[in-house]
């Protein structure tokens, strides 16, 4: 028989930099998980993606064991990296902060495809373009 799930914790942690300090410690401590075991495993699994923020979904079972699934970095983080900017525009409809090529949008959409509920790469590209637009990034062909 399968173990009973008692909690699902969703966090966004910088790759390879999970430590018991907040927000990781309190979120997992409440669920009764061995925080250091999670940190070591997460850091080992995400060491090759340094500099990116990785969303993670931790499933905690009745016996306090856990499993976790790492997802692809948020589109906004990938767009900022592609455009070489620190943050998006405060007023995206007035101030444009960067310009990126459509090829780069396709690359990001292909990377995000497993986590998006899009049927085609074109639909995924439209989602990424919408995120870019709301950040004040202009997309050119």
Curated annotation (Swiss-Prot):
Of the GO CC terms on this record, one is:
cytosolic large ribosomal subunit
Enumerate the InterPro entries for this protein: Ribosomal_uL11, Ribosomal_uL11_bac-typ, Ribosomal_uL11_C, Ribosomal_uL11_C_sf, Ribosomal_uL11_CS, Ribosomal_uL11_N, Ribosomal_uL11_N_sf
GO-annotated biological processes: translation
Supply the PROSITE patterns for this chain: RIBOSOMAL_L11
CDD domains, alphabetically? Ribosomal_L11 (cd00349)
| Pfam families on file | Ribosomal_L11 (PF00298), Ribosomal_L11_N (PF03946)
Gene Ontology MF, one: large ribosomal subunit rRNA binding
UniProt family annotation: Belongs to the universal ribosomal protein uL11 family.
Q: Which PANTHER family match?
A: 60S RIBOSOMAL PROTEIN L12, LARGE RIBOSOMAL SUBUNIT PROTEIN UL11M
Q: Which HAMAP family does the record associate with it? A: Ribosomal_uL11
Per the entry, what this protein does is: Forms part of the ribosomal stalk which helps the ribosome interact with GTP-bound translation factors.
Q: Which NCBIfam families match?
A: L11_bact
Descriptive protein name: Large ribosomal subunit protein uL11
